[in-house]
Amino acid sequence: MTSSRAVVSLFDIEKGVNDTMSISQQTGELVSYETGAAAILRSQGLPASDDYALTSSPLRFDDGGHYRIEISGVERLSTLEALLDESAKRNVHVHRIVAFGGGATLLDRGELTAFADLARESKIQVIAVPGPRTGWDTGRQALSSEGTTAGRRVRGVDNMRFLIDDYLRIFECGFRGVLVWDEGILNVLNTARTAGDIPEDAVFKVSVYTGYANPAGIKLLEGLGADSVNPVGDLGRPMLAAIRSSVQIPLDVWAMTFESFGGMNRLWEAGDIARVAAPVYFKVEPGESEGVMYNAWIEPEFHEKLVRHKVRHSAILNELVTSTQKSVGVSPTPTRVS
């Protein structure tokens, strides 16, 4: 009788995995010949292990692309202008930007509207960051050394209202994409989108600060209305492949991370990450720390210089994907964005 499982060695999989385990030829799962937990996970449509077979994702963006480029920290109009100039020089299209890391509240309506108009003309989707909110209100837990582990949840109803008004101001200035880091707020926004209380084409990107790192959690966010999710930045390819097997929405994966958040550089892995986790937004965000990069008083020239580095690194990512995974393609420049 031929077994449906192919036994593999420790070297073949990952350090520390017991050699009595095996990889399923059908699913790529690593399992210990059934456990109660494995049965429970499968019964709920979840994988029973990370995908050590690194199964290719069957999903793509609607234009056929495996991945798109996302650059964070586009703080004001002059930063966007520098990004566009460098993109033209390096022949790389930036599909999406995360804007106003220091908080959209700190830009006036004229600045916000001009930014939205230029991004739309340039076929770039914007994810606008509201605030500053959590960590800048009167609550101190979120800033304490151990309180940071609780995440950036919104404290109380007043802060919920302030935040939602911030989102409404962003929508009124012409943006459609927003960053969300509280599951309750995500549910409120999704309900409002369904009810027509906010634009029906609003886009919700769930922040890495929610701390999700497995298929069950990201499937939950998808059900709450997330349009893409940024899982924690240090997930291996088997973990990302397992997440992809459970959800349909794009994953936002850091290709370069700022130093205070780990400083990971995954440029050489990008092609294979896109192969197993497509559709993927590759986030390019080198730098020192949020505290240095995203505050309201830093000089505009700092961001203009830094964003040029981010575009250069994005061009290198495209080059390395092409050289390492010839079957993986980047999305073309879109004809329009919301």
Task: Briefly describe each language-model feature range.
Residues 213-217:
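Short, glycine/polar-rich helix-capping loops at beta-to-alpha or helix-loop-helix junctions
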Residues 7-175, 180-212, 230, 237-338:
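Active-site pocket-lining/capping segments in soluble small-molecule metabolic enzymes
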